[in-house]
């Protein structure tokens, strides 16, 4: 699909791509731009909402600005922003398929009388219809009415009603609230009855916000709206009342739940969806089966009445054909998880709109010219720097509750705001009224497949469909717009006991000058508003100790002070204590209790936690409701059955009851997730806010000290270096905070699981034991009453069909732990890996490729004469000519006073060197670190800006052998560790080393030697002896390829071959046009046979397969055949002669060492896109190894 980017707001009206149209049911007109078939953009504020809203109707977190998007420059920015976002979506296969479906998924046409279905309001525009080619063709057909025909509902109309333009969606600017996105259906009945209706998207592309460390990608926000529009186009909108309990609100005195709309839950992805997919019985609402029936109804009408009807134009028929290629289940399975991976984007791991309860949004201005393109943020979602929007001053603050903390005399000490989550709330206890169905079979199971739900969409076919030009308009295609104004009230409560929110607020100040205090009561009671609460005991002790020392007026004094501040902050914020393992928890975060007033008693936090257990951390503990259940008695009509027939019937009942027991188990699990885990998640969010508050305080203390220092007599160049070093330390402080956040997250997630295992699951077991006792009694009594079986047969049936405890032991700890390891978080881990540089070298078809695969986008410049030769485990850099150089540029390489780093690489030196010759380093103006050759040995040197220096000489490594060098700098421990291979050869104190702020460039240089370097990496953390040993031996061992069971891959041994994308579907031989190919089996009805694979060694001395080996692959299917490549279609074809087989290179994937790649002439074997019933094994033209379909698994 092409996105029309040749548009601007001054483009002339042509009644084709640029039109003036009427807003539905109004006399409002706007200029619309067609950016793709049936997809329009209107760079205007949404007409359906008033721009001036009374204060009482403005919602918390909203921004209301009636002047926004009123200038032509703003409208132009809006139009171009939407075009860029659509091009970004269209730049991926999955996004292109989504836009193709939206373009073709037209609402079902009204009024085709000849087909025998209803045609309400068919005569809508005067007494005679306008001349129309479609209508004229229908008139000449066998339709009994002269003006009969179908009419379309997906159109926008010109201001004079003369022209109609096909439209499935229109993208407007925001409505009243300029930071609220929304999707609005045209006609409610059609949105719910299977007919379908067009949609209006209300969208804000010019502002974005942050979640944790990353900016929200506006392309993902638009994708969310596009997915939602499909629910309306397909007519499968659920009732507004179809909501599920999302979390128990702990901040309210009564038991109140937040509820989440089912569409938002399905679309958002993340942990919420991961949890849903573990429970096949979550949804028992009739919406799901009814939607499927409605879809099948209209699909059947299309098949029987429209598909073969020559009176209906291809512009309609072919669109409906593509629409019905996709099932309703495919729409339900569409969520942001799929798109975040194909877009290489990060998304919030939970429903983001609800997170405003924990994170108050600040908005940033999007600059699409400099910071964004069709690949997303130019510098990534984390590293991009966007300016804060001036609209933030207008953010509405309407807390849901104000907590007034008073003393014993009822004098107010502080007021703290508790904000709502923006979700619908209810005091109804969902679990006390919900009855688990016994006989109803409409539970909906979500698809766990990795297959993209829209793979059936043919992009090529969609592109070839003629556009809809002649419209037969159905006038009643929309409802009247009703703008509902919602009021929000703030409730104030009084408490004598400080809550967590009070403790959190006491850690926040707007004052630049303040004093830290560990006495909360003193902070809130004092008239001195400069006191701020802190739990950083060691830092406060250090600051108290030095307060009477002399002024800090030199760079050295400042560096020593800053170093101690950093160390003490790191120690305090990451302080933990090991405990005897409690339900998998063997480490407790010590500051947690003091930070949020959790378990603050006369005992220590650890003692109280060990005494009271994990459930003591939350405020609402007695929430569990025993489920309402129903189970049918065994029918007396079975009493006279024979033993065989009765056995079969009882087995059916027994099996059905086991499934019902699982439903009961999942009901308990649901309650844990909604009512218990939601409280732990709230604590996680508050703890993170507390960490950020403490970090902010420390940074302000440092900033104040730097301001004082700048008044001293310090040279400008030195002051500039101090400023840059301080900024680098601020980054290191944030990194320490992130480590602490990770610990809190891990601790509280484990605590929540502990509650399920120790508190909730035993109650489930106890409940079930009572429940099955009653069932067993009834079963025994029934069997004893049976008249057509003997006593022995009765005994057999009683033993077989009475339940035991083992029948309902469903606890699976690992599946619960997996809730917190979603695909979204895995993307985060990949981007936030410790690697700042991970060098990868390979031979391309025309030149060598030397690149950074750490994900940190390092710029690499190198001398083209550098050769690649096979080294220890892959391609190594061979620098043999004088002054051959590789430069690595990245801001992450800039060192300072407090950051840790590690350098690792394999080195082989051939020659002799007496003079000092540089190898690699990051050093400018005699400040930084470097590694050089001297006296036939290797030297590591680190020197700071004050001239303090440490050098370590390493001998006996220049002898033509390979050595694994690891150098670790730990600034918290002031420790330098150096390893050669698996041995620690140096452990040196570097406590005298201060700032080594130098440059963002690391240079690898050869002067007059011959050197080989492989697997060069730079990490942002120190490395331990255990990690070095593991890396060293795994790297050596990694030269051998392994099968799926981690065993060494052997030549001449039979294996089953799977693709990484389809790990449970093996390859089969398929005959096509008298040639044999390999494919996945995608259709049960096709009779194709599974085959075995064998790798045949070219080097007969080899037993095991190593990386970069060349071999011949044999396929065993009765006879031996061999892999070749078809010159006609690049498919892997099978030939009978080994002489005609290709010599194929075998390797492993760097990130997935259990996966294998096959290549020939640097072209990799992969699976093709779906081709009818097949995914062929093909030889791809890409010269790099992408993920997914290019990866293979061999199973013995």
Curated annotation (Swiss-Prot):
InterPro entries: Bot/tetX_LC, Clostridium_toxin_transloc, ConA-like_dom_sf, Nontoxic_nonhemagglutn_C, Toxin_rcpt-bd_N. NCBIfam families: botu_NTNH. It is found in: Secreted. This is Non-toxic nonhemagglutinin type C. It comes from the Viruses. It comes from Clostridium botulinum C phage (Clostridium botulinum C bacteriophage). Belongs to the botulism non-toxic nonhemagglutinin family. GO terms for cellular component: extracellular region. The lineage of its organism: Viruses, Duplodnaviria, Heunggongvirae, Uroviricota, Caudoviricetes. One of its GO terms (biological process) is proteolysis.
């Amino acid at each position: 699909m092409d996105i029309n980017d040749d548009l601007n707001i001054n483009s002339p009206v042509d009644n084709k791509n640029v039109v003036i149209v009427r807003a539905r049911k109004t006399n409002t007109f706007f200029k619309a731009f067609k950016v793709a078939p049936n997809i329009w953009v209107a760079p205007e504020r949404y007409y359906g909402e008033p721009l001036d809203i009374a204060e009482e109707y403005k919602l918390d977190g909203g921004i209301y600005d009636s002047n926004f998007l009123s200038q032509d420059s703003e409208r132009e920015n809006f139009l171009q922003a939407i075009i860029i976002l659509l091009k970004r979506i269209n730049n991926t296969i999955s996004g292109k398929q989504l836009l193709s479906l939206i373009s073709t998924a037209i609402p079902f046409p009204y009024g085709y009388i000849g087909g025998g279905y209803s045609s309400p309001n068919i005569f809508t525009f005067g007494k005679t219809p306008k001349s129309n080619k479609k209508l004229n063709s229908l008139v000449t057909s066998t339709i009994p009415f002269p003006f009969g025909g179908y009419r379309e509902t997906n159109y926008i109309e010109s201001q004079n009603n003369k022209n109609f333009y096909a439209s499935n969606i229109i993208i407007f600017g925001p409505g009243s609230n300029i930071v609220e996105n929304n999707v609005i259906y045209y006609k409610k009945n059609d949105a719910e009855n299977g007919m379908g209706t067009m949609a209006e998207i209300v969208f804000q592309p010019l502002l974005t916000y942050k979640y944790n460390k990353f900016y929200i990608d506006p392309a993902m926000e638009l994708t969310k709206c596009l997915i939602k529009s499909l629910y309306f186009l397909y007519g499968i909108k659920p009732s507004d009342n179809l909501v599920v309990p999302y979390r128990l609100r702990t901040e309210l005195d009564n038991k109140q739940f937040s509820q989440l709309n089912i569409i938002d839950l399905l679309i958002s992805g993340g942990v919420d969806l991961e949890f849903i997919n573990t429970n096949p019985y979550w949804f028992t609402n009739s919406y799901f089966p009814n939607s499927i029936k409605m879809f099948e109804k209209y699909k059947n009408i299309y098949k029987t009445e429209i598909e073969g009807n020559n009176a209906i134009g291809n512009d309609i028929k072919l669109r409906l054909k593509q629409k019905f290629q996709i099932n309703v289940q495919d729409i339900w399975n569409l969520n942001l998880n799929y798109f975040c991976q194909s877009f290489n984007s990060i998304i919030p791991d939970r429903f983001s709109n609800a997170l405003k309860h924990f994170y108050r949004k600040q908005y940033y201005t999007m600059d699409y010219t400099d910071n964004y393109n069709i690949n997303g943020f130019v510098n990534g979602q984390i590293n991009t720097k966007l300016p804060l929007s001036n609209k933030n001053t207008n953010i509405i603050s309407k807390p849901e509750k104000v907590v007034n903390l008073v003393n014993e005399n009822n004098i107010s000490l502080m007021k703290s705001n508790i904000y709502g989550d923006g979700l619908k709330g209810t005091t109804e206890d969902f679990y006390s009224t919900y009855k688990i169905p016994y006989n109803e079979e409409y539970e909906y199971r979500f698809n766990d497949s990795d297959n993209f739900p829209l793979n059936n969409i043919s992009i090529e076919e969609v592109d070839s469909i003629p556009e809809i030009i002649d419209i037969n308009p159905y006038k009643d295609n929309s409802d009247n717009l009703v703008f509902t104004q919602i009021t929000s009230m703030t409730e104030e409560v009084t408490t004598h006991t400080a809550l967590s929110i009070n403790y959190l607020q006491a850690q926040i100040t707007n004052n630049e000058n303040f004093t830290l205090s560990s006495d909360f009561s003193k902070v809130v009671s004092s008239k001195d508003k400069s006191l701020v609460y802190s739990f950083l005991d060691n830092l406060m002790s250090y600051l108290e100790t030095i307060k009477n020392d002399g002024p800090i007026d030199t760079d050295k004094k400042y560096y020593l002070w800053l170093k101690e501040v950093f160390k003490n902050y790191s120690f305090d914020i990451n302080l933990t204590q090991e405990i005897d393992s409690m339900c998998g928890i063997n480490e407790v975060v010590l500051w947690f209790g003091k930070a949020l007033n959790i378990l603050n008693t006369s005992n220590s936090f650890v003692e109280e936690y060990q005494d009271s257990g994990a459930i003591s951390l939350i405020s609402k503990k007695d929430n569990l409701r025993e489920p309402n259940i129903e189970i049918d008695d065994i029918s007396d009509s079975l009493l006279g059955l024979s033993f065989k027939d009765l056995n079969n019937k009882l087995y059916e009942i027994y099996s059905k009851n086991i499934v019902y027991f699982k439903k009961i188990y999942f009901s308990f699990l649901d309650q844990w997730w909604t009512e218990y885990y939601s409280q732990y998640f709230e604590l996680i969010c508050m703890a993170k806010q507390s960490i950020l508050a403490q970090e902010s305080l420390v940074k302000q203390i440092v900033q104040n000290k730097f301001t004082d220092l700048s008044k001293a007599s310090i040279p400008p160049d030195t002051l500039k270096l101090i400023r840059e070093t301080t900024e680098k330390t601020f980054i290191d402080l944030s990194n320490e905070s992130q480590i602490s956040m990770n610990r809190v997250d891990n601790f509280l997630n484990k605590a929540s699981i502990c509650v399920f295992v120790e508190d909730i699951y035993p109650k489930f077991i106890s409940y079930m034991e009572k429940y099955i006792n009653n069932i067993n009694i009834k079963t025994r009594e029934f069997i004893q009453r049976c008249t057509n079986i003997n006593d022995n047969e009765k005994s057999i049936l009683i033993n077989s069909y009475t339940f035991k405890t083992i029948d309902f032991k469903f606890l699976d700890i690992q599946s619960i732990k997996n809730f917190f390891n979603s695909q979204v978080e895995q993307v985060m881990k990949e981007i936030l890996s410790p690697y700042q540089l991970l060098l990868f070298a390979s031979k391309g078809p025309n030149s060598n490729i030397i690149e950074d695969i750490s994900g940190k986008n390092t710029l690499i410049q190198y001398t083209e004469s550098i050769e690649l030769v096979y080294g220890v485990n892959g391609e190594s850099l061979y620098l043999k000519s004088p002054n051959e150089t590789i430069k690595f540029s990245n801001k992450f390489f800039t060192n300072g006073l407090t950051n840790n780093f590690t350098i690792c690489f394999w080195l082989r030196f051939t020659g002799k060197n007496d003079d000092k010759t540089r190898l690699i380093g990051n050093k400018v103006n005699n400040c930084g670190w470097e590694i050089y050759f001297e006296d036939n040995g290797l030297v590591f040197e680190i020197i700071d800006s004050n001239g303090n220096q440490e050098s370590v000489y390493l001998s006996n490594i220049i002898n033509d052998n390979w050595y694994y060098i690891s150098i670790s700098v730990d600034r918290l421990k002031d420790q330098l560790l150096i390893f050669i291979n698996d041995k620690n050869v140096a452990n040196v104190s570097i406590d005298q080393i201060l700032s080594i702020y130098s440059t963002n460039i690391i240079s690898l240089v050869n002067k007059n030697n011959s050197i080989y370097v492989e697997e060069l990496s730079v990490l942002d953390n120190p490395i331990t002896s255990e990690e070095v040993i593991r890396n060293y031996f795994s790297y050596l061992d990694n030269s051998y390829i392994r099968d799926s069971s981690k065993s060494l891959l052997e030549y001449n041994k039979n294996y089953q071959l799977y693709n990484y994308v389809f790990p449970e579907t093996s390859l089969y031989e398929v005959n096509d046009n008298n040639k044999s190919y390999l494919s996945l089996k995608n259709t049960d009805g096709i009779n194709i046979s599974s085959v075995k694979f064998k790798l045949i060694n070219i080097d007969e001395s080899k037993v095991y397969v190593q990386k970069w080996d060349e071999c011949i692959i044999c396929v065993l299917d009765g006879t031996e055949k061999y892999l070749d490549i078809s010159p006609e279609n690049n498919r892997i074809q099978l030939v009978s002669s080994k002489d005609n087989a290709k010599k194929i290179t075998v390797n492993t994937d760097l990130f997935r060492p259990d996966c294998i790649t096959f290549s020939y002439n640097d072209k990799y074997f992969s699976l093709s896109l779906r081709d009818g019933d097949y995914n062929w094994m093909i030889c791809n033209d890409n010269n790099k190894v992408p993920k997914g379909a290019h990866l293979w698994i061999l199973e013995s």
